[in-house]
């Protein structure tokens, strides 16, 4: 049984990004906006700041205890017009009453490093990828690195952050894809029928050995907190001696995801330098 670790992939991608920045003379910059004081969001923001500094990307966190939707959109408009800012990212979760997709709709597609704007999502659907969501990209990075190409895949998630873009990105790469969700009647029959299972349901231990086969490859996108420990959506203890391969949580998809946000910043900076 193989453990599919993400740290080495993230390090190699970071080294590549550092080389691109040094050779090109780019000075990429990312503006993070956080509203409130959610600890998980703060940890993720600090991780991007640390990784950015190591790679050569200026990452700045702008925090608000309280701000109206109107004022937030005005601030985004100012950042959209600022040529010194290459990427804009809104940290989740947002306070009640804020419409995340209305917010990202106001971020220019070439600064939308979360890649959740209608334009960037549409480019994915048309197989014209530009900036892509970091977590789906991380899943594909793991498949590429460990040599799982053009297989059958079942995704247990249909969100615009993971399941929907990932399904289209996999189709673009000649995978055969099934998507399950909360209304799927027999998820286990779907997951057992695919070589690769990607799970992202927000339920610790959801995926167990009854839902997979000994030849399954499990990519766990879930992040849950149980007794002050971070665990995934797959029952790692149950599966680790049963399936062919599995990503750990933490240490699997997560390290690559943060680096992929910064990869989008570099792509955005290159585009803006050459086209604006």
Curated annotation (Swiss-Prot):
Lineage, uppermost ranks: Archaea, Methanobacteriati, Thermoplasmatota, Thermoplasmata, Thermoplasmatales
Entry binding sites for NADP(+): 157-159, 182, 223
Metabolic or biological pathway: One-carbon metabolism; tetrahydrofolate interconversion
Domain of life: Archaea
Its EC number(s): 1.5.1.5, 3.5.4.9
Catalytic activity: (6R)-5,10-methylene-5,6,7,8-tetrahydrofolate + NADP(+) = (6R)-5,10-methenyltetrahydrofolate + NADPH; (6R)-5,10-methenyltetrahydrofolate + H2O = (6R)-10-formyltetrahydrofolate + H(+)
GO terms for biological process, alphabetical: L-histidine biosynthetic process; methionine biosynthetic process; purine nucleotide biosynthetic process; tetrahydrofolate interconversion
Gene for this chain: folD
GO cellular component: cytosol
Protein name per its UniProtKB record: Bifunctional protein FolD
Keywords, sorted A to Z: Amino-acid biosynthesis, Histidine biosynthesis, Hydrolase, Methionine biosynthesis, Multifunctional enzyme, NADP, One-carbon metabolism, Oxidoreductase, Purine biosynthesis
A single GO molecular function term of this UniProt record: methylenetetrahydrofolate dehydrogenase (NADP+) activity
HAMAP family named among the record's database cross-references: THF_DHG_CYH
Family to which the UniProt record says this protein belongs: Belongs to the tetrahydrofolate dehydrogenase/cyclohydrolase family.
């Amino acid at each position: 049984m193989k453990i599919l670790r993400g740290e080495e992939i993230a390090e190699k991608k970071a080294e590549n990004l550092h080389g691109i920045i040094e050779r090109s003379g780019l000075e990429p910059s990312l503006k993070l906006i956080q509203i409130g004081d959610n600890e998980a969001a703060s940890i993720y923001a600090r991780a991007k700041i640390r990784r950015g500094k190591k790679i050569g990307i200026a990452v700045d966190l702008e925090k608000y205890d309280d701000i109206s939707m109107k004022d937030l959109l005005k601030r985004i408009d100012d950042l959209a017009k600022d040529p010194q800012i290459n990427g804009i990212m809104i940290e989740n979760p947002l306070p009640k009453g804020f419409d995340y997709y209305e917010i990202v709709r106001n971020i220019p597609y070439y600064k939308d490093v979360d890649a959740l704007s209608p334009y960037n999502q549409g480019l994915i659907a048309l197989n014209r990828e530009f900036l892509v969501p970091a977590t789906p990209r991380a899943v594909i990075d793991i498949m590429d690195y460990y040599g799982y190409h053009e297989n059958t895949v079942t995704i247990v998630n249909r969100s615009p952050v993971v399941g929907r873009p990932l399904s289209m990105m996999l189709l673009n790469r000649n995978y055969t894809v099934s998507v399950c969700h909360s209304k799927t009647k027999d998820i286990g029959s779907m997951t057992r029928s695919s070589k690769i299972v990607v799970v992202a349901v927000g339920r610790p231990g959801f995926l167990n050995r009854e839902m997979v086969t000994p030849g399954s490859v499990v990519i766990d996108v879930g992040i849950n907190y149980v007794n002050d420990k971070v665990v995934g959506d797959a029952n790692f203890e149950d599966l680790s001696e049963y399936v062919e391969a599995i990503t750990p949580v933490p240490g699997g998809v997560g390290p690559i995801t943060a680096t992929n946000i910064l990869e989008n910043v570099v792509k955005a900076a290159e585009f803006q330098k050459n086209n604006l």
